[in-house]
Structure formats: C-alpha cells, structure tokens
Amino acid sequence: MTLPSIAIIGRPNVGKSTLVNRLCQSNDAIVFDKPGVTRDRTYQNASWGGKEFQVVDTGGLVFEDDSEFLPEIRTQVFLALEEASIALFVVDGNQGVTTGDLSIAKWLRNSDCKTIVAVNKCESLSLGISMASEFWKLGLGEPYPVSAIHGSGTGDLLDLVIDELPKDFDVEDKEDKVMMSIIGRPNVGKSSLLNAICGEKRAIVSDISGTTTDSIDTLIKKNSHLWKIVDTAGIRRKKNVKYGTEFFGINRAFKSIDRSDVCVLVIDAIDGVTDQDQKLAGRIEEQGRACVIVVNKWDLVEKNNSTIYQVEKELRSKLYFLHWSKMIFISALTGQRVENIFEHALNAVTQHRMRVTTSVVNEVLKEALGWKSPPTKRSGKQGRLYYGTQVKNQPPTFTLFVNDPKLFGITYRRYIEKQIRLNLGFEGSPIILLWRGKQKRDLEKETSKKNINIIQKD
C-alpha cells in the first residue's frame, strides 16, 4: 500500500526539519542553525489518529537565487510537491511575511496541491495567534501557529492534516490492474495512440509539440484484464525544459515509468531513433521495466517487402538497451495493429513476473556449459560456474555462484543471458544476472543444506 505524503516546504532556516522531527517523533532529520543543511528530499513514516502517512522534508526553497545548490534544491522541492497529498508551508513567525514567502505562496496557489500554512517559532500561545494573523496575506487560507521546538500547536496541526488526507488513497492498490505507460518524445503520436486504444477522443491531439502537459490515466477492460493506461507528457531534453506545467508533466512521466508494469515506448517511423529516444530507452532498462517498442506512423512510410526488416534492424541497433523488447509497427491514425499492443504487453508483464525453480535454472546452465565452457585466463585459471538460482522477479533476477566473477568477461556473460532467454523466454522483460564469488568450503555447506547439485566442480 502506498502511503499518502505530506511535503514540508518553506524558505531556508524556518524550522522545517525540526517540525519534521516533531511530527514523526524522531530525530532523523538533521537540524542545524544554518540555511541549506537539507538539500535532498527525505522521507519518514508517521501516524496520527490511527492513520499512517509519509512526511517529506525538503531543502530551503529560494526562487530569486541560482547560486550553489539552489536550482537542484528547487527541483527536489518540486518533485516532493508533485507526489504529495498535502503541502505544509512552514513560515517564520518571528520574521513575519518576507518576499521569499510571497514567492513561494504564489507558486503554491498555482499548484493543485492542498496547502496548509504552519507559522513556526510561535513559542508563546497568546503572541502566536497575533503573529500568525499576518500570514493571511499569503492567500492560502488560515495560518496555524506552532512551535516545532516545544511542540505546542502541532497536535492541532496534525488533526487538520488527517482531515485533509484522501479517504480512499489505498483503494487503487487493492485492485488488480496492469499499469501500462505510453512513453515518448513530444509529437510522436502518444495521445493519438491512447485515443485509438480507447476508441474515443480521450486526449487532445494536435501537431503542436507538447500538447499533453500532464499524465492522463485511463481505465479500460481488454482481454479479461483491467488496464490502467497512462499517456505521459512528451519528454524533451532537460536544457529545453522550464519550470511550470511541462516540468511537472515530465516528472510525472518519469514516475510513470518507475511504477509501470509495462512501458510502451513510442518511436516516430519518419524520424527514427533520436538521442532522446535512446535516453528514454535507457531509463526503462535502468528501472527494470517490461517494455514493448511501438513504431508509430507506419502508414506514412513508403515501403516494399523488405522495408520492415531493414527499418527494424536499424532501430534495434540504436535501441540496444531494449534488445529483449518486442517491436511492432502501427498507425495510431488508421488503427493498424493497435490491438496487437495488448497481446504483446500482457506477454511482457507475464514474463516480467515469472519465477523459475532452481532445478530448471541449473538444467539450463548445465546445458550452456556443455556447449561452451567458461574462459581460461592466461594464468591458467578457469572460471567455474557452480550453480544459479532466481532470487526475485519484476524484473527476473538470477544469482550465479562462481569461483571468481573476474574470470567471466562480458562476452561469456552475454552468452549465459542468451541461453537463459532461449530456454526460458522472458521476451519483453529485462533480466538481471548477479555474479557472486563463492569459497569452496562455503559452497559445499550451502548446497548440501539446500539439496542443490553443483553443476561444475573444481
């Protein structure tokens, strides 16, 4: 179950980390009387009134200065707000309303996140109410006086937070859905593809790059499965992206990749694979997501009997990160082969979730060793592959126990991966091979305990 999160936001040195420690009843957040101590966003679990949630501590937010780490801190704060259910805007009651507070308030008013203003450093109850009243001018509703250091007012603040948390935040996680994200550069036809999949105009489509600025979620039933399809904002080069709706949309797109069961990477058949396409492919591979490569606008390509083979060869040479992905050629405009996406996506998800018994893994490894022995170094020392086992899925991950991982070069490692794929499948899914050195004495104890036969002995 994913817990709702509360983002703690404010200028440097207003007491955000102290308030985090108070709300979470911990001392995990570093507190020091100097601006800029917190840079990255950090997460802590908390509970109040029988409800659990996450508290996200962020660095001091400054819009008027780009020195040192301030731009990076801004990015972290923006990310925290994007995933938050509530923003807790912390201000300094002793200093009153500053220009920095006004800048942050303006930004928060333009966001979709519910915001609560916490006026910190109100150590005196009677003075606190007076100090807090000044912050009505921020335009974010009633300000609440608190003292993070003494704890006064924090209970009332938590009561308010609990009342504002979504009541059904965990419903989605209880439903059995396949989450499929449509990923790609701007204007490759992602929204057209979503419309073709849904059979209706679900997303705005135009020739203007960047029409979709946010992730659009759609639930549909296909082949007895419930699919949650996410049409993401087009992802451009980082240097071309400014803060605002596009920034938030792109970060949602990256989060969609990370949370997806399967990604549909859309490539423009006319433009081919660009540098940005390669970066997206790398992100999918890095996150270990299942993937289907969809080449859109195939109806616009002049072709003969061999065109599809030539184009696929060229595209795969540039998308080598995803050599294991199925590639299909479609037209979102005409609907050509769009229905095939579900078949291949479901197969990729199934392969991504698959588990293989240790005995079957070792049968495959034994056969692979029979065809090609591990290499021998100039020193005369030869690699020994003792046994392997699958340790997890999503993505499928195998640990291979050997005498010395350094004796197994990249060529032989690729050979073993190829043999696993040839015998066990995993089309549409990455697999991870972890090569672990094992002492002979420890090996014998472990294999006898688990009743595993050693494939290759010293």
Curated annotation (Swiss-Prot):
GO molecular function, one term: ribosome binding
Binding site for GTP 2: 184-191, 231-235, 296-299
Residue span, KH-like domain: 354-439
EngA-type G domain location: 4-169, 178-353
Membrane spanning stretches: none
Superkingdom of this protein's organism: Bacteria
Binding site for GTP 1: 10-17, 57-61, 120-123
CDD domains: EngA1 (cd01894), EngA2 (cd01895)
UniProt entry tagged with the keyword Nucleotide-binding: yes
Keywords: GTP-binding, Nucleotide-binding, Repeat, Ribosome biogenesis
Gene Ontology biological process: ribosome biogenesis
Homology family: Belongs to the TRAFAC class TrmE-Era-EngA-EngB-Septin-like GTPase superfamily. EngA (Der) GTPase family.
Function: GTPase that plays an essential role in the late steps of ribosome biogenesis.
Quaternary data: Associates with the 50S ribosomal subunit.
Name of this protein: GTPase Der
Upper lineage: Bacteria, Bacillati, Cyanobacteriota, Cyanophyceae, Synechococcales
